[in-house]
Amino acid sequence: MRKKAVFFDADGTICDMKKGTPDSAIEAVRALIDNGHEAWLCTGRSRAFVPWYLEQIPFTGMITACGSTIEKDGKRLFNKEMTPEIAKLSVEVLRKYGLIPVMEGADYMYYDKDEYTDEVNWYASLITEALGDKWRPIRGNEDCMQINKSSAKMTAGCDAEAALAVLSEYYDIIRHEGSSSFVGNTIELVPKGFNKAVGIAAVIRLFDIPWEDTVVFGDSNNDLAMFEYAATKVAMGNASPKIQELADHVTSDMFHYGIRDGLRYLKLI
């Protein structure tokens, strides 16, 4: 079989905020690589928010922050950052309209713990724990944040449309469907022109990978761009309706051997 480059989303696909990554998924990725293929993480998380349970997976490389950062073999090859001025403006606009800013960078994530709490997202303290010394408060760093993207947490009474009307000059907007446990009340703000597909396109150009050998696994609407781009698309069993519509195959969820079974279906392991 031709060598394939397989790109895996993180949350909801190959890891869970509470449970980490199932052993079956780790073993499947190892088998994929042993068979001569490439395995890439392709996540909306910024590089700072790639914790131990993702680091333990032997990925060929990582595309993080929706295409804003690319690394291979532990070496950072590309890192698109918003200017500190736009980062500061983003915080001010989101707060003005009642949204909570979480600012995501390759080296640090920035948010204020008295503002971004478990009452806003049940997993907020888990993020803080996973980040360790890669967490920074916004307070005191307003003028020097180094970020790739932002996440806006919606709260009761917020005016998200007013905030996005201002910030859409600088960001592309990703809206999530429904009230899933991880992304239901989050709006992602990604640098203009960047998404997971852009990251994948850059990787295959850099490393001479034919487009027809690209495979993606994903579940949420921040995977839409890569599902519209890649040659072969596998949706997880818990995927959003839009992702399932675009998929060539729908596997089960990660805790019911979805990664393993999806790779077996494609005859890659």
What residues fall within each predicted segment?
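Conserved acidic, metal-coordinating active-site core of Asp-based
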Residues: 99, 104-217, 221
